[in-house]
Amino acid sequence: NLIGLLTLLYAGTTWKILDKSFCFKYSKKNTRLVFIFIVKMLKQLSISAGNLLNKGTSETLRNEITTKKVSIHLPKHLKPANDSQFGHYLAGLIDGDGHFSSKQQLIIAFHSLDIQLAYYIKKQIGYGIVRKIKDKNAILFIIANSKGIERVITLINNKFRTTSKYNQIINNIFAHPRFKEFSKTITLGLNSNNNLNNHWLAGFSDADASFQIKILNRDKKIEVRLNYQIDQKKEYLLSLIKDNLGGNIGYRKSQDTYYYGSTSFGSAKKVINYFDNYHLLSSKYISYLKWRKAYLIIQENKHLTESGLSQIKKPHPYRKNIN
């Protein structure tokens, strides 16, 4: 006789243990071996039962079951540690607010609050100027030097993700005679990797994201919503973010734009996990801290109290408004 497939009833659910042909020829000699095997499988089931249970639950419930709480301790704020990390951050920043112009320049726009970030970018690249735009709360970081443009392209190659920036480099930079030799030394490519385990999203968010806290009063019940939002003309980058962080994508017909929002508490947790590891460098970091603190209050259900709600409503001491 052969023992070809073993099933057992565990925690009220029938679990299929052997999907492959694990067979034991029956004999008195190996009866003990079969018994040991069954015991080991039972132990494995007891360890993995929680994971298997999650397959049948909704995303919200699954998050409640498995999500480890966000720590009240804030990680030390760090900048990218090397050219590779900085290249990912710069690629995200350029994908969001950068432009390779027909004058063979790189131009990145910043809010006037982020002038220190503009000078940091200049220092890391080693080229460029920072220029204030008259009568506007904006500044420009501009690189016109050939060596500076070449360094930027080397830094972001295989790290940036937008086809528009790829086409700008091909048509506005490589097509110009002074970059002819450089274009022969580099194989330009987009980052097609689907994970976000680098600084790209931090740079992209410093350019285009906002951290929103919405307090709603519905049927005499207070509801606090945390929304990390990004608006784009194209949907594909938002789909990448959604695949990694959860959330939803919408479309505004009147503006012909798509928007991503981290609408659930579980998605907010994933947003925090990312930005606690890959830090924002602009003034949006202050907005993120306020947003993160609101999450901690909700996490402990303190938003249901007057004191907790007042803490969420309180302006951040270092900034009056949330981006």
Swiss-Prot record:
GO cellular component: mitochondrial chromosome
One GO process term, biological-process aspect: intron homing
Highest taxon of source: Eukaryota
Additional free-text comment from the UniProt record: This protein is coded in group-I intron 2 of cox1.
GO MF, one example: endonuclease activity
Keyword Mitochondrion listed: yes
Main localisation: mitochondrion
Gene3D superfamilies according to UniProt: Homing endonucleases
PANTHER family: INTRON-ENCODED DNA ENDONUCLEASE AI5 BETA, INTRON-ENCODED ENDONUCLEASE AI3-RELATED
Lineage, uppermost ranks: Eukaryota, Fungi, Dikarya, Ascomycota, Taphrinomycotina
Subcellular location: Mitochondrion
Keyword DNA repair among UniProt keywords: no
Name of this chain's protein: Uncharacterized cox1 intron-2 37.2 kDa protein
InterPro entries referenced in this protein's UniProt entry, alphabetically: Homing_endonucl (IPR027434), LAGLIDADG_dom (IPR004860), LAGLIDADG_Endonuclease (IPR051289)
Keywords: Mitochondrion
